[in-house]
Every structure is written in structure tokens, then in C-alpha cells.
Amino acid sequence: MKPTLVLVGRPNVGKSTLFNRLTRSRDAIVADIPGLTRDRHYGHGRLGLKPYLVVDTGGFEPVVKSGILHAMAKQTLQAVDEADIVLFIVDGRQGLAAQDKIIAEQLRKTGQKIILVVNKTEGMPYSSVTAEFHELGLGTPCAVSALHGDHLGELIDFALEGYPYEEETAAEPGQEKCPVIAIAGRPNVGKSTLINTLLGEERVIAFDQPGTTRDSIYVDFEYGQRSYTLIDTAGLRRSGKVWETVEKFSVVKTLQSIEAANVVILVLDAHHEISDQDAHIAGFILETGRSLVVAINKWDGLDDYQREIIKREFERKLGFLSFANLHYISALYGNGVKGLMPSVDAAYAAARAHIPTPKLTRAMLAAVAKQQPPRGGMSRPKLRYAHQGGENPPLIIVHGSMLEHVPQTYRRYLENTFREVFKLKGTPLRVEFRTGHNPYAGKKTPLTEEEARRAHSRRRRNRKKYG
């Protein structure tokens, strides 16, 4: 097991910057704004041969008893319970604050191993920058600069000292990868509630306020004896409504998380009509080629008439998602949630399907025999064979002649045929048409010696005859 390091401290002391340094990534959003990180954020790091897990937490406000700051404090305490080592971060430039004393007292009650880390110490002598923090009674402080990376190696060495570790074995060549699932949708549609229902614990903040999740949270879990990684993305809203710079960062992280996923569960709100923004999110998922499962949330409490309206609206506005499995769920009460994971598995398998060339060609020729492509001018396109050109999503390449004249309707006909024959449910499917190259096109055929002699004789006769 990897040791777990949890970063704790009051707002804006540099926890997310330290997280990015320790994981050698830019997975946590960093800006000079207090209260930026709200959920637990997990990342992997390594010092030499020693791997470790790092958990970034929101700014700790233990004295707040209600609202979202209280929920953030609960998240921090849950992370501390999971920790092997707690890195208590304080600000060396601002000095010891009253809130630091309150947090230190709270951490002492947990009984966990605590290391006091004085951040933002670049250019400052150790003795002067750490002197006042001895008052906290947490042992010798470690002075670091997360921004510049100073003394971080010594910090991790000290934190992992005496901790047993095992060398990680490489994955077997045929070993199946862990599917990565992104939960995406507009703000406040119930994405975090859905994750908590799937996990059976309150892992991410579920709060009735749009924009609660600002970062993309990675959570490993097992379901049905299979391992998965879930990503709770920040809610996407129209760019015109993205006022805060931080929220713009969150949108970028959301789009990156969708690109990093194998399967995306698109969550829609049954209590609000399907908007253009829902369609834009779905369009982006398709552009990136990610497999898709659609979940219409908050289905409970609707009567039959309202449900029928929602179904018709989905067909009208999101009909291009007909390839995806559609589920009507209540994330809050768990209704219909169990059906999501089989659809995720099916979509993941379809995206990684390997289809032999003979089978693809037979399916294509059977479709052509059933319905010929329409003529393009004086000639009809000829489809000769098909093969798979890629996966995730599947790419099928059709070869033939005059294929530039194949209309869009016939392309969709072939796509639907391939999807039906090979059961490619839940994944986008791309079909490319390639016309065979004629190496002699636009070139004159050279004359043989005999043909050249006869041509010369004809020209001489014509000159004599016509002067």
C-alpha cells in the first residue's frame, strides 16, 4: 500500500501549489484566491523508488458551523482520517495566525502523525521564519517553497522515513486497463450526488448551490469486482456566464477530464428543459470520441405527462445521441443507478472492439447489396472492402472508387449498419471513405518505338498532302 499524505491548512497557504509539485502535475487549480479548493483531490507521486498518494484539501475553516465552508471542513477531517501522514501547511510570510492554532488543536485530537510545513520561505533564513511556529507544539518545522520547489525532497524523505514500501510490478502485457469514467453536465444537475451514491460514501461535496465543484476530482473505486476511476467534473455553463477567472480554469479542467476519460456519463436535469448548453457538452464529448452513457437525473417526483414531455424533448434536441444507452435515475435516492455500470462496461468494450477485415467487408457488401449507393453524375460509387483503422472510438475505413460522391445519407446508412451488426452500443463510430489512387491519372502514356515511327510517318504524309 502507498502511504497517504494529506495536505491541511487554512485557505491560501499554498496547498494546491505543493500538491502540483509533489505529483509533478498541474492537476490542482492554483490561483491567489482563498477557498479555491473545495473537495479532496487525489494524486500520485514518487520519490526515487518510493511511491505515495497525495490528497489536497480545501482551506480548513473548523470554526464555521454551516454552509459550504462547513462542508469543506468535513471533507478535510474525512481526508485526515484516511491519512498516514498529515502535512500541516502554514504561511511563512504571513507568520503564525490565530486560525493556525485552532487547526493545530483539531489535528492533535486525531492522533495522526503530523508534520508542520512552513511554506513560502524562499529567500528567508530558517531560524527566523520558523521561530514563532514552535509555539504550535508540533515538533521541528520543515521550511519549504512550493512555488520554487525548495527542500521538497527533504520533506518527502522525512515524511516517508521508516515507512515500508514494495516495488510496484509492471502490468502484464494482456492485463486489462482500469476504465476512467467522467461524470459531466451543467452545474447543479446532481453529478457529485451520483458519485456519492455509486461509492456509498460522501466523497465529494454535494450542496444545493451551482458551481460547488470547481476542480476535477479523481476517485478510485471497485464495482462488481472491477476497478474504475471516477472523475467528478466542475459543472459546465455557457461561456457568457463564466464570470470568475477560477470558473474559467474549471471549465478547462472539465474539458481536459472528458478528454482523459474512456467513458463519459452525461447527467441531465429532468426538472429543467434540455438546453443548448446540454447539446454543446454532448457535442464536445462526441468530438473527442469518448464513449457515452446518458443519465436523466431527478426522475422521481415527475408525473407520467411530465416524463413523456422530457422523453420527446430529448429525442428532438439530443437525437444525435441515439447510439448511447439512456437511463432515468434519481441519484439522491439511488433509483436506476445500478443500471449505469453495465452500460459503462458495454460502451467501454465497444470503444475498444477489434473487428477483423473480412467481417467488416462482408457486412459492408451485404449493406451494398441491400441498398446501392446513389449515382454521382454518370457513374455509381464502388465500395470494394473495409478495414478497421483505429479504436476508442472505432474507425472504419472503406476503400473503393468514386467515393467522394457518396452522400451523407448513405454514409449514415453504412454507419448504422456497422453499429447494428457489430453491436457497437455507446461509442461514437467514425467511417472514412478513401478512393483508390490511379498512378497514371493525368499522365501521358509514352509511345513505343514502332508507334513513334508510325506517328512520324503520318505527320510527313499530312504535310505533303495538305502542304
From Swiss-Prot:
Pfam families: KH_dom-like, MMR_HSR1
GO MF annotation: an example: ATP hydrolysis activity
Full protein name: GTPase Der
Lineage: Bacteria, Pseudomonadati, Pseudomonadota, Betaproteobacteria, Nitrosomonadales
Swiss-Prot/TrEMBL keywords: GTP-binding, Nucleotide-binding, Repeat, Ribosome biogenesis
Functional summary from the UniProt entry: GTPase that plays an essential role in the late steps of ribosome biogenesis.
Species the sequence originates in: Nitrosomonas europaea (strain ATCC 19718 / CIP 103999 / KCTC 2705 / NBRC 14298)
Domain KH-like: 353-437
Annotated EngA-type G domain residues: 3-167, 179-352
Binding site for GTP 1: 9-16, 56-60, 119-122
Keyword Nucleotide-binding in annotation: yes
Binding site for GTP 2: 185-192, 232-236, 297-300
